[in-house]
Amino acid sequence: MKQPWVRFAFVVIALAAAAAVVIGDVRRSAAERKLREAILTELQPVVLKNCTLKRFGSENDGGYLMCENLIEPLDTGYSYGVGSNDDWGCEVSRRYHVPVHEYDCFDPARPICNGAKFIFHNECVGDRTGYRDSHFFDTLENQISKNGDAGRRVLVKMDIEGGEWDSLLAAPDELLASIPQLAMEMHGFDDPKILEVLRKLNRNFHLVNLHFNNWSCTSRAAPLPAWAYQVLWVNKRIGIVDPMAPVPAPMSPLNAPDSPTWRDCQLHTSKPAR
């Protein structure tokens, strides 16, 4: 039979171990919350004095806001993550009579758009060149260069389910500085590289629109209302910030729920942007 002090020691050790687990969980939870708060701090949209917003693409999921008056002159478009539908690329190609390069290495479906010029590439954008399983990836810089578009005026739309972080982290600042507008959906809230990419983008662009995808509403992302969000980045070379407008800028009424039937979840702002 064990001595009482031995049993007592076991109890103390067990309680200490349990306390260490709880303390570790609390610290981890606090660190994760701090990361999400830092991400939200980087997602502060501004109003541009010289931007007329217009929605391009679908009425709901698949629609993106851009500064219509800052698009031309335009040489070509790049659409990453297309699947069977690319209303954004369709509208850009038809409206501005330019080709749109379509990239997707996972979904074999190819969108059709009468009157548009689509150039399909069975590859994805990533942080390096090469195959991952049977899927070929290349960098944003290489893809633009291979198509002869280096130094040309291009629009970029990106919805690649989390692959944006590595892809943009690998993109040189010089390349990002040459892109007038970048419309995209971003995914995630718990990876430190998200913060690194957002800070990199904020060096080169103004964040002009922020809309959360209501397919992804979750309290786990708080203070973010969802884990996926559409954004518009406008190059600082062409965008002029309105110093009299509030920051963060109120959300434009041109935004629409990705799902018209699910409850929406947006950050609260005082009034619609003009």
Sequence positions of predicted segments:
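N-terminal secretory signal peptides that target proteins for export/translocation
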Residues: 1-2
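Phosphate/nucleotide-binding beta-alpha loop and adjacent structural elements of enzyme active sites
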Residues: 5-15, 19-274
